[in-house]
């Protein structure tokens, strides 16, 4: 993976050079989480890996190159920064008017990147956590962070300057720091908690996305959603095999809902297997998992208080329902059931307003 990233970043920069775009392109390289839980690789002595509340799980590189803006390398930024700072920074760099009525969680770090600042940077506090559960749990896998301190899970305090590997819990030695970080987290949680029930909804019937395409990756479930093709191909059982979508019906009217085991472009029957995908040199690709054949006899659809069911014709590629929906937010669940009672979620659904 490292070699692949290196090669492709090089290709991208070569294109920018050849097109004469390098000078005034803001080029950013970063990652979405800490070191992978796969092969053991260099982790700079940090504790934890991907998904961890310790720095090894969420501290990531962030490189910016922009010659026209004076960013050509050779400068390290010491104060703590985070992903919430990216948008405010780009707004300032590009001289874009900040949208009215929007309060950003982050702040522009342009002055830190350029070194052109005549005032001290504030000792700010940031929070990250790794919930990975349906209903968030206070303090779960959390880190309350300053440039010096890490309060993990509300109990462990680490001086990241003296102990970057987070080996020595010094919470008992610094009660005032623990209290300060705890108070910040409590206020942060109180602000967010009322929004937990308002999960993002997928719009149905919007002119810009009609039909709407729903996949199992967006299921809300108590298990782990099928987030890669291997999960779908294996037709996992248990909590991870069913779920529901939060949806928002944009306009009242008649809708067609088509349920599929495989995506429309695969053009396969619901009860058909799927051949393994082409391998990827040097890696185990999710698509190489053979697609398991299931044999459901009925398809069920629930949207809000409306429930309906249909028999699945032999070798059908999809099951279609025509229903009338009222505008507003609701939930949608679609399943396939076999004769033996085993239930599978409909991994793909296509919703069209007529």
Residue ranges and their predicted role:
Residues 2-5, 76-83, 102, 174, ...:
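Aromatic-acidic/polar surface patches that form glycan- and anion
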Residues 35-53, 71-75, 79, 84-87, ...:
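C-terminal cap/loop subdomain of S1 sulfatases and analogous C-terminal strand-loop tails that border
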Residues 9, 13, 17, 87-91, ...:
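Non-transmembrane alpha-helical segments in soluble domains
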Residues 4-43:
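Metal-dependent active-site segment of extracytoplasmic phospho-/sulfohydrolases and closely related
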Residues 86, 170-354:
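Long, internal low-complexity/basic segments
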Residues 63-73:
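The feature captures the short pre-catalytic strand/loop hairpin that immediately precedes
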Residues 2-5, 9, 26-31, 61-62, ...:
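Beta-strand elements within well-structured catalytic alpha/beta cores of enzymes
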Residues 65-67, 160, 350-354:
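Short beta-strand-to-coil "C-cap" segments at the C-terminal boundary of structured domains/repeats
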């Amino acid at each position: 993976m490292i070699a692949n990233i290196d090669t492709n970043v090089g290709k991208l920069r070569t294109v920018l050079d050849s097109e004469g775009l390098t000078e005034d392109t803001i080029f950013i390289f970063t990652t979405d989480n800490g070191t992978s839980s796969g092969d053991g690789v260099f982790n700079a002595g940090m504790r934890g890996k991907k998904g961890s509340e310790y720095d090894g799980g969420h501290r990531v590189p962030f490189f910016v190159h922009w010659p026209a803006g004076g960013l050509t390398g050779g400068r390290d930024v010491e104060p703590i920064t985070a992903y919430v700072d990216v948008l405010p920074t780009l707004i300032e760099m590009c001289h874009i008017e900040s949208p009215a009525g929007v309060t950003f969680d982050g702040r522009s770090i342009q002055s830190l990147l350029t070194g052109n600042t005549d005032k001290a940077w504030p000792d700010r506090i940031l929070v990250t956590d790794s919930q990975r559960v349906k209903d968030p749990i206070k303090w779960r896998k959390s880190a309350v962070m300053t440039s010096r301190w890490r309060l993990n899970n509300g109990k462990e305090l680490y001086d990241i300057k003296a102990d970057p590997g987070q080996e020595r819990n010094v919470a008992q030695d610094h009660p005032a720091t623990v209290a300060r970080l705890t108070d910040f987290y409590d206020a942060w949680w109180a602000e967010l908690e009322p929004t937990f029930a308002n999960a993002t909804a997928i719009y149905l019937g919007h002119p810009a996305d009609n039909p709407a395409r729903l996949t199992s990756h967006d299921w809300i479930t108590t298990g782990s959603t099928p987030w890669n093709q291997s999960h779908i191909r294996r037709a996992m059982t248990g909590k991870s095999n069913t779920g529901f979508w939060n949806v928002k019906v944009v306009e009242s009217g008649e809708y067609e809902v088509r349920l599929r085991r495989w995506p429309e472009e695969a053009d396969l029957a619901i009860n058909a297997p799927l051949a393994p995908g082409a391998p990827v040199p040097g890696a185990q690709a999710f698509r190489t998992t053979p697609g398991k054949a299931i044999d459901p006899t009925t398809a069920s659809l629930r949207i809000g208080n409306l429930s309906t069911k249909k028999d699945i014709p032999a070798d059908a590629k999809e099951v279609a329902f025509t229903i009338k929906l009222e505008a507003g937010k609701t939930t949608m669940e679609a399943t396939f059931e076999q004769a033996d009672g085993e239930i599978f979620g409909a991994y793909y659904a296509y919703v069209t307003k007529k």
